[in-house]
Regions:
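A general secondary-structure junction signal
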Residues: 22, 116, 162-166
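Conserved non-cysteine loop/helix-boundary elements of the Radical SAM core domain that shape
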Residues: 1-114, 121-140
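Auxiliary Fe-S-binding modules of radical SAM enzymes
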Residues: 124, 131-174
């Protein structure tokens, strides 16, 4: 198991703990028991949205309830909770993104990451884009929406670890 590799570094005090990211529907008592044994400190969930309509349309494979249950378990186990969100997913609106941010706060997130939705070739989202069923946010909209949810997090004491993605090849601009 990969988590074993870093244990000597933790024992020597060179590393404090481990941060990892996973899907909300992967979290269970058994998984959390294992992660606790391996000195995991922070678990980030790729929630992306807390609107079931958006999650279904994007075929995320998890529901808002999955995020709620996983978040509750993570906090109950004493882990730091990170919840990642995306702005501009199919059927998203600025209001829905703000509601997702407020829900992330109410779930007790310690930190978050805000990502604008980007179209990557050979994905379901790219198919939707090419069919005309999805229109990505403009740069201006992505900045505005990200700023709005950022304010919600900062005013609520939730640490924002990142806004946006590193540029990379293969993205389709909107």
């Amino acid at each position: 198991m990969y988590l074993e590799v870093v244990q000597p570094y933790i024992k020597q005090g060179l590393i404090e703990g481990i941060r990892l990211s996973t899907r909300p529907d992967y979290i269970s008592v058994a998984v959390l028991d294992t992660l606790k044994r391996y000195n995991v400190k922070t678990i980030e969930l790729g929630a992306q949205s807390l609107c079931d309509e958006i999650l279904t349309l994007c075929e995320r494979g998890h529901s808002v309830r999955d995020v709620e249950k996983a978040s509750s378990l993570i906090k109950e186990y004493g882990f730091s909770l990170g919840l990642q969100m995306m702005v501009g997913l199919p059927s998203d609106t600025l209001e829905r993104s703000k509601q997702t941010a407020q829900k992330i706060v109410s779930l007790g997130a310690d930190n978050t990451r805000i990502y604008p939705t980007l179209v990557i070739p050979n994905t379901k989202l790219a198919e939707m884009y090419y069919r005309g069923d999805y229109r990505p946010l403009t740069i201006e909209q992505a900045v505005e929406w990200s700023a709005e949810v950022y304010k919600i997090f900062i005013q609520s004491g939730v640490s924002v670890l990142r806004v946006g993605l590193h540029p990379s090849e293969g993205l389709i601009s909107g």
